[in-house]
Amino acid sequence: MARISGIDLPSNKQLKIALTSIYGIGRTRALEVCNKSSISPSKIAKDLDNDEVNRLRKVIESDYVVEGKLRSEVAMSIKRLMDIACYRGVRHRKGLPLRGQRTKTNARTRKGKRKTVANKKIASK
């Protein structure tokens, strides 16, 4: 089983799909990595030998930001937005959508489960 960037690649999948299990590598980037390391993207991950795994590891670690480092970069950029208190940072802090979506009726994913107000109908009479 190949282990790259602290992630065990799924052994029964094609390399172009198996590489997408690494955070920061999608389909397009997986194909780029395969081309740079001169390995067939349709090769099954369990059929890789140590030389090919080392080439993949070298390409990924030298050219791309993946896994923990990428997660920390994303978290730091969100924290920076919150610290400077720009519009996006304030929306992050409040847990609301950032990009102008309506919030009167939708945005349930971002806002979370409904919080009902007790006796609201009685008070409105």
From Swiss-Prot:
The record's GO CC annotations read: cytosol; small ribosomal subunit
SUPFAM superfamilies named in the record: S13-like H2TH domain
UniProt similarity note: Belongs to the universal ribosomal protein uS13 family.
- Record key words, sorted: Ribonucleoprotein, Ribosomal protein, RNA-binding, rRNA-binding, tRNA-binding
Q: Pfam families from the entry? A: Ribosomal_S13 (PF00416)
Question: What is the role of the protein in this entry?
Answer: Located at the top of the head of the 30S subunit, it contacts several helices of the 16S rRNA. In the 70S ribosome it contacts the 23S rRNA (bridge B1a) and protein L5 of the 50S subunit (bridge B1b), connecting the 2 subunits; these bridges are implicated in subunit movement. Contacts the tRNAs in the A and P-sites.
NCBIfam families listed in its UniProt record: uS13_bact (TIGR03631)
Q: Which HAMAP family match?
A: Ribosomal_uS13
Q: Can you provide one Gene Ontology molecular function annotated for this UniProt record?
A: rRNA binding
Q: Which protein, by its recorded name, is this?
A: Small ribosomal subunit protein uS13
The lineage's top-level taxon is: Bacteria
Q: Where is this region: Disordered?
A: 95-125
